[in-house]
C-alpha cells in the first residue's frame, strides 16, 4: 500500500474541504458525521456557524453583523467573553475548529477574503488556554515573507488538516493577468507553536506543484 505523505494528505483534504464548502447548505446535513460538529447558516443577514470540539463542552458561535465578526465561546471555565473584530472590506469564507498543538483543547479559525479582484486571504484565530480562556493566534502575512511571497497575488485557500494549518494560492509569473496565473500552486503548511507573547503559526513545509 502506498504511503500518503503529509503534503498529499493536506492537498487531498483541502480539496475535499473546499469542494464541500462550495456545495453550501447541502453539505451541512452531514456535518454531524464529520469530526468537527458544526451548524452553519449563510443568509443575506450574514454568516452563522456553531462549532463544537468533539468530546468536550467547548464550542464557538461565529457570526457576523454588518461589518463586525462576533465570536462567542462557551464551555470555558474562566472567561467566555464575546470577541469582536471589524471586518470591513472582507467576507467570511468558512470557520473551522481543531486541535493544532495537540494539547486536547481546540483552536477556532475563521477564514476571510478581501473584497475585490485580489481576494487576499486573512485568518482570525483563537486558541484555548487549558480550557480556561482564549488568546488570539498570529499568522504572519505572506506579503511580508520574502521566502514565500514571490508570485503571490492573493486568491488564498485555507484549511485545518489534522493538526496542521494549510494555506495555498496560485503563483503568478511576470506578465500574468489576475485571471490567468501560470506558475502553479504554492502550498504552505504551518504548525502552531508558543511565541513570546502568544501562539503563532510557524511555517513547517512549503511545496509547489
Which residues make up each language-model segment?
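Acidic, small-residue rich beta-repeat scaffolds with periodic aromatic anchors
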Residues: 4-8, 17-58, 147-209
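Beta-propeller blade repeat segments, especially FG-GAP/WD-type strand-to-loop junctions
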Residues: 70-79, 120-140, 192-194
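Short, solvent-exposed loop/turn segments at conserved positions within beta-propeller repeat blades
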Residues: 64-66, 117-120, 180-185
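Repeat-based blade/solenoid architectures
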Residues: 85-94, 145-152
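Acidic/hydrophobic-patterned starts of short beta strands in beta-sheet-rich repeat architectures
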Residues: 102-112, 163-166
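Beta-propeller fold detector
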Residues: 135-142, 202-206
